[in-house]
Design a protein with these regions (language model features):
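Alpha-helical hairpin
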Residues: 2-3, 38, 67, 317
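Contiguous, well-ordered alpha-helical segments that form the cores/surfaces of helical PPI scaffolds
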Residues: 11-16, 295-298
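N-terminal helix-turn-helix
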Residues: 13-16, 20, 27-79
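Intrinsically disordered, acidic Ser/Thr/Pro-rich low-complexity regulatory segments
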Residues: 80, 87-319, 323-337
């Protein structure tokens, strides 16, 4: 869609004023605050054209204009430029997240919290499913003569332990041999690869018929999976209370209930698995719970873990600033993991 330069300028200032103050914008306000070189009649005609093509709308007939979802989309795609600006709080954020980096779950939770605090919106960190993570460590630990703990350590930093109950006792020397054999044949593989090929990899080993190996071979999907770990980390909803859009308690309760249900994880992972814009606005999100919201996301990835950082807020969130914040956060997290 081709707009004149004047229409672009007027649309940009209309949206940015609404983002800042949350009130419909009149031609008089645009004239007095931004465009005194244009008459109010000229500005009014431009606003009428922008409304006609669906970029703006009137809440009431006599009120000023507010952006539509299409207006926000055009603003994000066309009217704001990418920026490599470093936020003022960068060093402080990096220091705090680095201090939490010894424990991956603590780091991800701290990241979501700081993201919400700095953006003054709702921060979310979503990590990808673990099945593509690589097995770095596997340990068999004696709990008793017939109980063994299997410990899996992934390159992402996640650890899983599961107790194996045996029908016969096992001594330390045999356990040590089996443990070393599992290390030799399984470490360096992804969990998916182990699930698909464990029987083939172990069938020629001297201990293949041992009960421990048979337990693992007969049900690899049960044992070589990282389950029960959080995949979604969130900040507090407290920041959203600063916005009039969330003052109506029923709207906020509906949003909160959705975010604290299991469906959140499924929804975000389905959304993040597709090729998509890093900004989705209102009805683009595809769920009625979010029709008055926008989500801005940014991927992060290194050798250990990958995922997305997201910020959710009202549709009038400061898109340019949020994109800068997310870029800074992904840079920090890629350095500290």
């Amino acid at each position: 869609m081709l707009l004149t330069q004047r229409e672009n300028n007027i649309l940009k200032k209309t949206i940015e004023d609404f983002i800042s103050f949350g009130a419909p914008i009149s031609s008089q306000r645009l004239h007095s605050c931004y465009f005194n070189q244009f008459s109010t009649a000229t500005i009014r005609n431009s606003l009428a054209n922008l409304e006609k093509i669906g970029m703006l709308k009137s809440i009431h007939r006599s009120s000023g204009k507010v952006p539509t979802d299409n207006g926000y989309r055009y603003y994000v795609d066309t009217l704001i430029a990418e920026s490599s600006k470093t936020i003022q709080e960068y060093d402080n954020i990096a220091q705090k997240l680095s201090a939490a980096s010894n424990n991956l779950e603590d780091l991800l939770q701290a990241t979501a919290y700081m993201l919400g605090k700095i953006s003054r919106l709702f921060g979310i960190v979503v990590i990808s499913k673990h099945q593509k993570n690589i097995l770095n460590e596997i340990e068999l630990i004696h709990l008793s003569s017939d109980r063994i703990m299997l410990v899996l350590g992934l390159n992402s930093g996640f650890i899983r332990s599961i107790v194996l109950n045996l029908k016969v006792s096992i001594d330390d020397s045999v356990l040590k041999v089996i443990n070393q054999g599992l290390k030799d044949r399984l470490t360096g593989l992804t969990l998916d690869e182990i699930q698909e090929s464990i029987k083939e990899r172990l069938k020629e080993s001297q201990y293949f018929e041992h009960e421990i190996v048979q337990i693992l071979v007969q049900d690899p999907i049960k044992h070589f999976v990282i389950s029960g770990q959080k995949l979604v980390y969130t900040s507090s909803f407290y920041q959203l209370l600063d916005y009039p859009e969330f003052h109506e308690i029923n709207k906020l309760k509906t949003l909160m209930s959705f975010f604290y249900e299991k469906s959140l994880e499924e929804y975000l992972n389905n959304y993040l698995s597709d090729d998509h814009n890093n900004v989705i606005i209102g009805r683009e999100i595809g769920d009625s719970n979010f029709r008055n919201c926008s989500i801005v996301s940014k991927p992060f990835e290194n050798n250990n873990i990958n995922g997305q950082m997201l910020v959710l807020g009202p549709k009038r969130l400061p898109y340019k600033d949020i994109k800068i914040i997310l870029t800074n956060f992904t840079d920090i997290i890629n350095n500290v993991i």
